[in-house]
C-alpha cells in the first residue's frame, strides 16, 4: 500500500507521543569501536580509541548514536529510509521525503568495550512545521540486566518534507547558540578530514 498524498495526511499526536516500541537488541565488539573511531576522524596519536592493547583503551563516547542502524548484525546494514513507522497515529509516508534533523546525546557512564545491549525508545514528540513533519525520539542504551541504569540517552529528530499542515503542535523553540558579539574566540582549531570518512562511517551502521 502506497503512502497517502501529503494533503490528506493526518497525525493523531495523542496516540503517537509516548509510544514505546519493543526494545531493540544491539551488539558490538572492540573492533566495531575502533572502526567507528576511524570513521569520525580519530588520528593515530589517540590510540586509546584505536588500539585494543592501549592501557586506556575506551569507546568513543558518541558511539551509541550509530547502534540504532547497526542493530545486532556484524555485516553491513541496509537502511531503507523508513516510510512505515509502525507508530500508532503516524500513517505511512514517502521515505524519500525523510531527512535527518537534530541529534544530541547525554552520557551517564563509560561504555563497555563490547557485548549485547538494548535500545529503549520513546516517541517524544510529533510536530507540524507547516512544510513538513518532525518526528522526535528519545532512546536510552541499557544493559538488559540493569535497565534502570542507562549508559546514554539520545534525542534525535527526523524531518519529513511535505507532510505538514495537518494542524498539529509546532513544537518547542529550538535552543540557539550564537557566538557572543564583539568577542574574539578564546581558541581556534583547524583540522583536515579525509576524503574516505563517509565510506568508513557507513560501515558502522
Regions inferred by a protein language model and the residue ranges of each:
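HotDog/MaoC-like acyl-thioester-processing domains
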Residues: 2-22, 98-189
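Hydrophobic, proline/glycine-rich low-complexity stretches
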Residues: 2-116
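A mid-sequence, solvent-exposed acidic-amphipathic segment
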Residues: 181-205
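Residue-identity detector for threonine
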Residues: 29, 62, 73, 121-122, ...
Amino acid at each position: 500500500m502506497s503512502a497517502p498524498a501529503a494533503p490528506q495526511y493526518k497525525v493523531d499526536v495523542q496516540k503517537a507521543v509516548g509510544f514505546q516500541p519493543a526494545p531493540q537488541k544491539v551488539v558490538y565488539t572492540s573492533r566495531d569501536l575502533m572502526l567507528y573511531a576511524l570513521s569520525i576522524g580519530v588520528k593515530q596519536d589517540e590510540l586509546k580509541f584505536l588500539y585494543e592493547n592501549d592501557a586506556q583503551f575506551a569507546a568513543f563516547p558518541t558511539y551509541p548514536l550509530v547502534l540504532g542502524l547497526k542493530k545486532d548484525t556484524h555485516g553491513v546494514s541496509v537502511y531503507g529510509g523508513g516510510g512505515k513507522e509502525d507508530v500508532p497515529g503516524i500513517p505511512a509516508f514517502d521515505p524519500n521525503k525523510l531527512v535527518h534533523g537534530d541529534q544530541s546525546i547525554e552520557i551517564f557512564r563509560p561504555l563497555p568495550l563490547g557485548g549485547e545491549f538494548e535500545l529503549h525508545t520513546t516517541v517524544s514528540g510529533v510536530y507540524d512545521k507547516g512544510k513538513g513533519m518532525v518526528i522526535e525520539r528519545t532512546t536510552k542504551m541499557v544493559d538488559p540486566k540493569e535497565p534502570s541504569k542507562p549508559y546514554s540517552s539520545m534525542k534525535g529528530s527526523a524531518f519529513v518534507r511535505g507532510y505538514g499542515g495537518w494542524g498539529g503542535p509546532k513544537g518547542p523553540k529550538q535552543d540557539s547558540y550564537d557566538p557572543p558579539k564583539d568577542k574574539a574566540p578564546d581558541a581556534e582549531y583547524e583540522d583536515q578530514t579525509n576524503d574516505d570518512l563517509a565510506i568508513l562511517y557507513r560501515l558502522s551502521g
